Amino acid sequence: MATATENGHAPVPDENTAPDAAPAEQKEQTEQTEQKEEKTQTNGDIVTVFHDPDNFNVKHPLMHEWTLWFTKPPSGKGDNWNELLKEVVTFGSVEEFWGIYNNITPTSELGLKADYHLFKKGIRPEWEDQQNKHGGKWSYSFKDKRSVAIDDLWLHAQLAAIGETLENDGDNEVMGVVVNVRKGFYRIGLWTRTVGKSIPGDKNGTEGRSAAKGKEILENIGRRFKEVLRLKETDVVEFSGHTDSAHSGSTRAKAKYTV
């Protein structure tokens, strides 16, 4: 494994290396140190780590566990995409997320055709995954790579995903987010479980939804995604189904919805 660079970031992965996540313990120690600031009790007294050490070692769990994946740049035309896709690490708390994020290569330093994928645990970032095959994705391409703050935008996309702010409770659509590094652009995508189709209720009392409601849910997610990416009102974010993309032979198919 290569050594860290002078600016403190992990090295840019070469063709045969996926980015390593530093041990979570290192970040936890940093977080615990930062949290040794004074806090006020309801009675006005000051609480420090000396008064209540347990509260300064607490992890803040996320609603779901998430897995970070990395697609390393291909070395030749014969490379199998599945072999390029590497699982990096799974985490379930805010502290673990920051420990990972602060110790891997920034998106802006990745090689061409590299990708980061952040998906709920148990879901592979592939169209063929059982939980993805009926879904689709919102995506936007940033074509001026020199002027876009891709590291900040990717961070905000990840925080919105793990913070569960991209959809309403019960929508159950967001599967994960992805960033692609390409020669002429960066692209950030948000994968969903469905393409907005109707879902019947079941005998267990689970409420179904109409196709119109499904479309409304996806468009609401698209609008929130657009806000997270700090896009202008005139910018257009497109949604396409994975099946349509597969049939077109491209990661981009004709847009099913736009916001």
What residues fall within each predicted segment?
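Extended catalytic/binding region for NAD+/ADP-ribose chemistry, centered on the ART fold
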Residues: 82-104, 140
